[in-house]
Amino acid sequence: MKKLLLFVALLGLALPLRAQDDKALAAAAAKADLKLMSFNIRYYKPGADGNNGWVARRAACLEMIRAESPDVIGFQEPHRPQIDYLKVNLPEYAEVDMGRDAATDIEKKPDGGEHLMIMYRRSKYILLDSGFFWISPTPECPSRGWDAMCRRVTVWVQLKDRKTGKEFFYFDTHFDHIGKQARAESARMMVARMKRIAGEKAAVFLSGDLNTTYDNALLDPLKAWMQSARHAAPVTDELPTFNDFGKRSLWIDFIFARNARALAYRTLVDSGRYGVPFLSDHNPVYALYKL
């Protein structure tokens, strides 16, 4: 009886807090210029992941994207069949992508392997420029950097809001999951490249699976030049982003920004509402910004 009363009391406290949180999030959305999402969608491999495989998850992923309606999405890991599926089913978005193994290993990975892909709302933005580079000492060539296990690539776009004329740069990346030196060098290289491409005064955003936690000194170059949405936004959470299909809980997926004000940040963990246990082995995250 005491446990039941305690549960009811805690529930009574939680519901008003949730209502306040939802109200604050709605207020932030009303003020925001853009909504950015980062989503490691988990690579497609026929027969892999059992009930959590891509075919079992893809309709739920579409439903989530349509429900959240982000302006720009940075994807990590999609293979060509996943990209084609998203393009066909989300025609309101244009996309820019690059495979980390493109132009090499053609016989083994004819589709370019894992990609980085940015989708942006056609009706809202004009694409001014775009590009890509490998995260290595030879960024213009297909290459693997330092002690990385895999080739890693970054994709970027420069977008202009059709209505307001405001411009910004958006970079989408994926750091190596094995090489510690590679992750450290990747953070330094990302800052150098963003400065070179976007300059110091432009609004710049970076999203991605960085395969390390925020408190790790490897990310210091990024933290010195940009702000994490989770830390900067007044409406935020502290939920994990890597779920490993229920096996682990880590925060390794990020949205960073420079010269933009974060209004809200969210980790989407309620995949059950879309009819699946997990949308991916990573939880999508999004942030609302004022330019």
Give short role names for the model-derived ranges:
Residues 37-42, 75-79, 98-101, 121-122, ...:
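Active-site-proximal beta-strand/loop segments in catalytic clefts of secreted hydrolases
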Residues 53-60, 78, 111, 148-152, ...:
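Soluble or luminal CAZymes and related metallo-dependent hydrolases
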Residues 1-25:
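Bacterial Sec-dependent N-terminal signal peptides
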Residues 34-41, 61-86, 119, 157, ...:
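Active-site beta-strand/loop signature of hydrolases that rely on acidic residues for catalysis
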Residues 21-26, 124, 181, 185, ...:
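Metal-dependent phosphoester-hydrolase catalytic domains
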Residues 17-90, 100-113, 188, 291:
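N-terminal, active-site-proximal structural segment of metallo-dependent hydrolase catalytic domains
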Residues 45-50, 135-146, 173-181:
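Surface-exposed cleft-lining segments at the edges of enzyme active sites
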Residues 25-28, 76-167, 267-269:
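Structured beta-strand-rich core segments of catalytic domains in phosphoester-bond hydrolases
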